[in-house]
């Protein structure tokens, strides 16, 4: 069983992609996060056994895409990085510059690099932030989305995990093809924690108690 065999990654690297005059660049950040997830920080996933189980099930599943959406400051980026730490040695690539999605040459370089890594057996994992405008419609000029679809299904499908993060307020805004069964593991909406949920989260994290009188972002 994947969940029982899992051992947190003690040390790894996140390759963050940059855009410059010479094309796609790459930096390296050490990732020492052991991948421990506070399930209480993500109450919307409790019905699936908690965030830890949900993420492990995604990593073990054949589907490629996991879509995070919702208000800023609600924990999307944090859970993305937790997933990276639990990814069993995948080559993790972070993109948070929309220019890489918008410029066809850069988008093609990114997808080409992913295919090369996959062919070398490095099992790439893409963490794609700020994708709001680029996952909504398959239109002229949106080369990134078209290539993303080819990565995640069909004859060109690669062994890749893709986590999308946007500030969209409704999953219906995401292109239906990205949500297709077999391609997508699911959508997760990130919302504010209720006062009771926030208090419980602080208690579990062994933080100083605080009284909340209204819903708050996880970042608060």
Question: For each predicted feature, which ranges?
Answer:
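N-terminal pre-Walker A segment at the start of P-loop NTPase domains
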Residues: 30-59
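Walker A/P-loop nucleotide-binding motif
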Residues: 61-80
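Short glycine-rich substrate-engagement loop in P-loop NTPases that contacts/grips substrate
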Residues: 49, 88-121, 142
């Amino acid at each position: 069983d994947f969940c029982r065999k899992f051992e947190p990654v003690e040390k790894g690297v996140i390759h963050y992609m940059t855009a410059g005059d010479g094309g796609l660049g790459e930096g390296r950040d050490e990732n020492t996060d052991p991948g421990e997830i506070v399930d209480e920080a993500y109450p919307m996933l409790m019905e699936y056994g908690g965030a830890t189980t949900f993420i492990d099930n995604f990593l073990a599943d054949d589907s490629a895409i996991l879509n995070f959406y919702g208000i800023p400051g609600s924990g999307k980026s944090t859970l993305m990085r937790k997933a990276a730490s639990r990814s069993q040695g995948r080559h993790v690539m972070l993109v948070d510059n929309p220019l890489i999605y918008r410029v066809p040459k850069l988008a093609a370089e990114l997808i080409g690099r992913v295919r090369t890594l996959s062919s070398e057996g490095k099992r790439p994992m893409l963490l794609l932030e700020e994708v709001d405008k680029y996952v909504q419609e398959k239109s002229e000029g949106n080369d990134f989305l078209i290539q993303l679809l080819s990565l995640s299904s069909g004859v060109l499908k690669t062994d890749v995990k893709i986590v999308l993060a946007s500030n969209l307020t409704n999953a219906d805004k995401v292109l239906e093809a990205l949500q297709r069964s077999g391609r997508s593991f699911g959508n997760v909406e990130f919302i504010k924690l209720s006062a009771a949920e926030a208090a419980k989260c602080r208690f579990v994290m062994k933080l100083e108690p605080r009284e909340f009188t209204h819903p708050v972002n996880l970042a608060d």
